[in-house]
A protein has these predicted regions:
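C-terminal catalytic lobe of FAD-dependent flavoproteins
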Residues: 19, 113-114, 154-236
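Active-site catalytic microenvironments for nucleophilic, acid-base chemistry
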Residues: 29, 82, 216-220
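Mid-domain beta-loop-alpha active-site segment that forms a flexible
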Residues: 10-27, 74-75, 145-152, 202, ...
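Hydrophobic/aromatic beta-strand patches that form the interior of the parallel beta-sheet core
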Residues: 38, 69, 193-195
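Active-site substrate-recognition segment that forms the wall
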Residues: 45, 52-53, 62-190
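Helical element adjacent to the flavin cofactor pocket in flavoenzyme catalytic cores
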Residues: 4-67
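Short, conserved active-site loop motifs that form the nucleotide-linked donor/cofactor pocket
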Residues: 34-36, 126, 192
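Well-ordered beta-strand positions enriched in small/hydrophobic/aromatic, beta-favoring residues
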Residues: 8-9, 56, 97, 110, ...
Length: 236
């Protein structure tokens, strides 16, 4: 860190994951457990009648369903809209840039609080991520946004001069008006469950959300109280 630094908080249990490696492992474990995954297939609509969804319409045909979980991130509202179900989820664009040859760069994952930049280290790679542009639904990389990330990080960190940029990305975070996710059954469709709107902490809250949704579908007591995340809270 560059001077001056007024203070910092160290969380010994904090960790970071490599996104593509995590997804590969999730795919492996899901298929081992019996899940069917359809790569490159678009879900375009949900069909239903009399308060129950019957099928998910996809680019490879309809898939019959006893329950439908809409966990489509920033696109959840579009999918729910095909059922006439209003879902208050908006997109917030974020950007990231990854460098190689990060010897001498920070070894510990950190958040630069004042600048809202996340710093992650994967072996000899360094990744910077940030920005929260609400209403921007583009997944195109903004050079201005990425250059801004690099400038903010350079103000706070002693970065090696020979860093090699290897990747720029932009993605969409699903956000709700009150900052809390939507987890639970929709108001009009008894077998349609929302699991979206986690904003900046989708990876953190994803496992717990998945378990609670599975328990809800099976008629079990969820691991935590879902009432505060009830999608109907915006329609009361």
């Amino acid at each position: 860190l560059k001077s001056p630094v007024a203070g910092a908080v160290f969380f010994a249990d904090d960790a970071c994951v490599h996104p593509s490696q995590l997804l590969a492992e999730l795919e492996r474990q899901a298929t081992t457990a019996g899940a069917q995954l359809f790569a490159g297939v678009d879900a375009t609509a949900v069909r239903g009648s009399n308060g129950r969804a019957h099928a998910v319409c996809t680019s490879m045909g309809d898939i019959a369903a006893g329950h439908v979980v809409i966990a489509a991130g920033a696109w959840s509202a579009e999918l729910a809209r095909t059922l006439g179900e209003p879902v208050p989820v908006e997109a917030a664009q974020g950007s990231s840039v990854t460098f190689q040859r990060a010897e001498g760069a920070p070894r510990q994952a950190m958040l630069l609080g004042e600048d809202h930049v996340a710093v992650a280290r994967y072996g000899d790679h360094l990744r910077l991520a940030g920005w929260f542009r609400i209403g921007n639904r583009s997944t195109a990389v903004s050079d201005k946004a990425v250059d801004g990330l690099k400038a903010l990080a350079a103000r706070r960190l002693e970065l090696p001069p020979d860093l090699i940029e290897v990747n720029r990305q932009a993605g969409l975070r699903p956000v709700t008006p009150d900052g809390l996710p939507l987890i639970g059954t929709t108001a009009r469709w008894h077998n349609v469950i929302l699991a979206t709107g986690h904003g900046l902490v989708g990876l953190t809250m994803g496992p717990g959300t998945g378990r609670a949704v599975a328990q809800h579908i099976l008629g079990e007591q969820p691991a935590f109280d879902l009432d505060r995340f009830n999608p109907a809270r915006f329609h009361r």
